[in-house]
């Protein structure tokens, strides 16, 4: 009986539900408790802390259908998608898990029953092969004696090296920690496919397909490589839904299963393509729209780093494959609707964000179109200057690295012109860049350490702004010292301090440190691991290690910072209300003068949206709501609904900041006690800082009041200057604008008349080389627009000929404009671009353009008369 993909998923879950398993929903594609992963890439990710012994399992038996993405980091299938029948960036992983309950025997029995029983998947037993680790005799015996699978269908896989764990049939989470042997189940697709059984020399063919991996977690690997037995034996299995669907539906490819067939059919209709099953670009697009839509749904937005960068790569890869299919119009966002239609089982998740997902994809596609246009223009300039038929790899890398222009597109453009691209040079430039980035990171780490980690500082500044302390260490120029003298700068480390160290976007405190022997002015405070460093200068006396000290924070500055920090939390919550739940923090700055908040959003905020956000924040301020802090375990905070930054590492216990019933977030910063202390909130700026990332700047309290006064004064000056008031200021500005535009038109008319007259006067200087009319003329201080208009006017008068205008600017820079009429180009006599290239070769400089019009800047500071002679000589040689 035919089963669609939804039937197969549900059948898997129903089977394990009958076997006493709790069915757990898929987690998001952003791992909540594992910052080492870019994306959720397997079913076990959400249970990792259980396997590590950090969390206790709520259920002993669990089964899931987990959404996964493998498009970055260790598990990256992105470049394989579309070129193999199996690889996908987005897929679902079916899995059953046991946490200290059943082990190998039951896991193998369950797998065999589901796969072969007539009431379930009903696969032929003769088609199934299994592999086991060659030292896992227990699994081998179960397969051989209890399942009664033929011994020739059981393959023992050894280690690749002398290391027992270095085997395809041994799973480990990392170099240390939980691990164990695994048993993989393969399906034989028949002799119409090439390839041999697993473990053979021909195993990499298409005939034998791995469909299920059963991992038996029984060891704890130590740093020295020893394997200790775990007290709790666990099972972790994974079976790709799309792959098992292809087997059960009797098709040869993941892209031929029901959900992909429907999606690909819609893609072909929307993109107006034929032969969809011949061109693999369609496979790429079908896979990528799934990955992109679910990533955006789970909170990932296009960016220049991290998860957002991977998403941007996937989007752009899909667009490039669209271009390979001859589709140059914007199309990708249109595929969201059919995707939702055909993925019914999770359509509800996507449907509520359908418009938002489409908007993000449309915005990113438009941005990439601009990138491609700019990149093609830059590439064209490089190809014009090219000597020979090989484009330097560094140039191709610069286009890729600086302008985001894809290397494969550079190759395509060059290939059409018979130009080779230096792949080796590109790869070398990429390697150099990676090494440079690595070195920068190394520098950051070494600076962070500063050997300060030997001293832990206790922060007491939540409750007090002045306290007694002791100098534990002093640093100068990254070196530990015992004393700092008058007018010397340094870093002071205390055993406890009221000074807040710069972190979480909040700047460090300022203030003073007083001892019997000296006075230290603190200009900034920074955190170095568990150490808090006070940066500043000794204003008088000396500061020595071991001295008792009185540490006093600048109270006014701290108060302003705290007000702005609380306002930032109100701003974030208000932005989420107005713009949508996708608003997540990308960065922030909180100081005593203003606050800055960077967040994911795809469009410029409208005036109405900004006013609404302002009003919401001010309403919360005027409520004078209490601001409270609770310290709790991270898991409890997560379950409470507190906003948690995905990419940030947190301690086991965290501070949860609650502002009335309006905002709940994790925060280690300092805050007001009530919102009323903030006084007033005003947005001063909203802008883009990167594709998909917006920035809002705002002020509060007295700074906001000062800003209002400044705006009032500015408005008063405008009224006086325009002789208007608040009732007619807009009409006055409109009147001035119309008058200005009218004068501009009159000036343009006069300028054009002058150009025509001057052009007519030039005609008398036309001369012939052979039968071609030539005009070479020197002009002074003309703008590019005037030069273009004059050239156009002379062309119109000449009808046929070559025009060269040599323009000398007041800064003594020379630029040329060359124009050639259409008839001469068609007769292959000459073209403007070739002429400019000849001139640049002799006189030096840079230039470019079209066959009918080109221009150049001349580096050589020769006189214009000399240039005229060279140009004339060139024309004689060419013609």
Swiss-Prot record:
Catalytically driven reaction(s): tRNA(Ala) + L-alanine + ATP = L-alanyl-tRNA(Ala) + AMP + diphosphate
Keywords: Aminoacyl-tRNA synthetase, ATP-binding, Cytoplasm, Ligase, Metal-binding, Nucleotide-binding, Protein biosynthesis, RNA-binding, tRNA-binding, Zinc
SMART domains according to UniProt: tRNA_SAD
Matching InterPro entries: aa-tRNA-synth_II/BPL/LPL (IPR045864), Ala-tRNA-lgiase_IIc (IPR002318), Ala-tRNA-ligase_IIc_anticod-bd (IPR018162), Ala-tRNA-synth_IIc_core (IPR018165), Ala-tRNA-synth_IIc_N (IPR018164), Ala-tRNA_ligase (IPR050058), Ala_tRNA_ligase_euk/bac (IPR023033), DHHA1_dom (IPR003156)
EC class (word): ligase
Entry annotated with the keyword Protein biosynthesis: yes
UniProt-listed Enzyme Commission number(s): 6.1.1.7
Obligatory cofactor(s): Zn(2+)
Gene Ontology biological-process entries: alanyl-tRNA aminoacylation; negative regulation of DNA-templated transcription
A molecular function (GO) term: alanine-tRNA ligase activity
Domain of life: Bacteria
Gene3D superfamilies per record: 2.40.30.130, 3.10.310.40, 3.30.54.20, Bira Bifunctional Protein, Domain 2 (3.30.930.10), Threonyl-trna Synthetase, Chain A, domain 2 (3.30.980.10)
Location in the cell: Cytoplasm
Primary subcellular site in the record, as a coarse category: cytoplasm
Binding residue positions for Zn(2+): 565, 569, 667, 671
NCBIfam families: alaS (TIGR00344)
Subunit relationships: Homotetramer.
Domain-level remarks: Consists of three domains; the N-terminal catalytic domain, the editing domain and the C-terminal C-Ala domain. The editing domain removes incorrectly charged amino acids, while the C-Ala domain, along with tRNA(Ala), serves as a bridge to cooperatively bring together the editing and aminoacylation centers thus stimulating deacylation of misacylated tRNAs.
Role this protein plays: Catalyzes the attachment of alanine to tRNA(Ala) in a two-step reaction: alanine is first activated by ATP to form Ala-AMP and then transferred to the acceptor end of tRNA(Ala). Also edits incorrectly charged Ser-tRNA(Ala) and Gly-tRNA(Ala) via its editing domain.
Entry's family note: Belongs to the class-II aminoacyl-tRNA synthetase family.
Protein name per Swiss-Prot or TrEMBL: Alanine--tRNA ligase
């Amino acid at each position: 009986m035919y089963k669609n993909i939804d039937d197969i998923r549900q059948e898997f879950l129903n089977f394990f539900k009958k076997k006493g398993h709790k069915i757990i929903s898929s987690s998001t594609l952003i791992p909540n408790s594992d910052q080492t992963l870019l994306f959720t890439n397997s079913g076990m990710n959400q249970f990792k802390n259980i396997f590590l012994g950090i969390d206790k399992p709520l259920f002993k038996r669990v089964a899931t259908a987990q959404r996964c993405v493998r498009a970055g980091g260790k598990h990256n299938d992105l470049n394989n998608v579309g070129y193999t029948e199996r690889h996908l960036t987005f897929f679902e992983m079916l899995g059953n898990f046991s946490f200290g309950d059943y082990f190998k025997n039951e896991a193998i029995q369950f797998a065999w029953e589901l796969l072969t029983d007539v009431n379930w998947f009903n696969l032929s037993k003769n088609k199934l092969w299994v592999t086991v680790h060659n030292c896992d005799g227990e699994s081998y015996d179960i397969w051989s004696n209890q399942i009664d699978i033929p011994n020739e269908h059981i393959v023992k896989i050894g280690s690749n090296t002398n290391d027992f764990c270095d085997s395809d049939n041994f799973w480990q989470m990392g170099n240390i920690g939980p691990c164990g042997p695994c048993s993989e189940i393969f399906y034989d697709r028949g002799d119409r496919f090439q390839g041999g059984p697993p473990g053979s020399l021909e195993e990499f063919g298409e005939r034998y397909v791995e469909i299920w991996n059963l991992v038996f977690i029984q060891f704890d690997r130590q740093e020295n490589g020893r394997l200790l037995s775990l007290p709790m034996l666990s099972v972790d299995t994974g079976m790709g839904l799309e792959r098992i669907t292809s087997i059960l539906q009797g098709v040869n490819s993941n892209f031929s299963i029901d959900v992909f067939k429907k999606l690909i059919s819609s893609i072909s209709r929307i993109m107006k393509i034929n032969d969809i099953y011949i061109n693999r670009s369609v496979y790429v697009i079908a896979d990528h729209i799934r990955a992109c839509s679910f990533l955006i749904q789970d909170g990932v937005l296009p960016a220049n780093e991290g998860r957002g960068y991977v998403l941007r790569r996937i989007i752009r890869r899909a667009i490039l494959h669209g271009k390979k299919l001859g589709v140059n119009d914007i199309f990708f966002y249109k595929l969201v609707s059919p995707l939702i239609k055909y993925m019914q089982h999770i359509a509800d998740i996507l449907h509520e964000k359908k418009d938002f997902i489409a908007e993000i994809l449309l915005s990113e596609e438009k941005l990439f179109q601009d990138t491609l246009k700019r990149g093609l223009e830059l590439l064209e300039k490089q190809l014009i200057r090219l000597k020979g038929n090989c484009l330097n790899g560094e140039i191709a890398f610069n286009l890729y690295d600086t302008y985001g222009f894809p290397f494969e597109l550079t190759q395509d453009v060059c290939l059409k012109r018979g130009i080779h691209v230096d792949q080796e040079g590109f790869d070398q430039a990429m390697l150099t860049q990676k090494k440079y980035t690595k070195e920068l990171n190394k520098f950051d780490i070494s600076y962070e350490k500063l050997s300060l980690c030997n001293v832990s500082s206790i922060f007491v500044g939540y409750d007090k702004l002045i306290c007694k302390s002791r100098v534990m260490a002093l640093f100068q120029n990254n070196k530990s010292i015992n004393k700092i003298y008058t007018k010397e700068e340094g870093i002071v480390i205390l055993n406890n301090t009221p000074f807040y160290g710069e972190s979480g976007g909040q700047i460090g405190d300022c203030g003073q440190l007083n001892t019997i022997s000296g006075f230290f002015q603190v200009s900034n405070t920074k955190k170095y691991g568990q150490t808090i460093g006070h940066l500043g200068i000794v204003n008088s006396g000396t500061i020595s290690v071991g001295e008792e000290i009185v540490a006093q924070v600048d109270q006014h500055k701290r108060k302003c910072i705290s007000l702005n920090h609380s306002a930032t939390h109100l701003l974030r919550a208000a932005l989420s209300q107005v713009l949508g739940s996708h608003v997540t923090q990308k960065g922030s700055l909180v100081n005593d003068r203003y606050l800055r908040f960077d967040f994911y959003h795809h469009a410029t905020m409208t005036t109405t949206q900004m006013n609404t956000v302002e009003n919401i924040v001010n309403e919360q301020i005027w409520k004078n709501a209490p601001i409270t802090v609770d310290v709790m375990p991270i898991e409890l905070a997560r379950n409470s609904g507190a906003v948690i930054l995905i990419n940030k590492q947190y301690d086991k216990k965290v501070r949860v900041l609650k502002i009335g019933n309006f905002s709940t977030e994790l925060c280690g910063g300092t805050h007001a006690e009530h919102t009323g202390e903030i006084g007033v909130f005003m947005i001063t700026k909203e802008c883009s800082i990167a594709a998909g990332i917006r920035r809002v700047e705002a002020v509060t309290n007295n700074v906001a009041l000062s800003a209002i006064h400044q705006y009032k004064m500015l408005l008063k000056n405008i009224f006086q200057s325009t002789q208007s008031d608040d009732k007619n200021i807009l009409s006055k500005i409109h009147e001035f604008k119309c008058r200005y535009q009218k004068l501009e038109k009159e000036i343009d008319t006069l300028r054009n008349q002058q150009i025509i007259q001057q052009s007519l006067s030039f005609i008398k200087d036309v001369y012939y080389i052979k039968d071609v009319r030539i005009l070479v003329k020197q002009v002074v201080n003309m703008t590019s627009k005037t030069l273009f208009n004059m050239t156009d006017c002379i062309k119109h008068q000449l009808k046929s000929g070559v025009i060269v205008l040599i323009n000398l600017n007041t800064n003594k820079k020379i630029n040329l404009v060359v124009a050639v009429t259409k008839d001469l180009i068609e007769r292959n006599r000459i073209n403007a671009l070739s002429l400019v290239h000849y001139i640049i070769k002799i006189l030096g400089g840079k230039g470019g353009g079209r066959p009918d019009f080109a221009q150049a800047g001349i580096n050589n500071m020769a006189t214009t008369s000399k240039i005229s002679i060279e140009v004339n000589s060139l024309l004689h040689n060419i013609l």
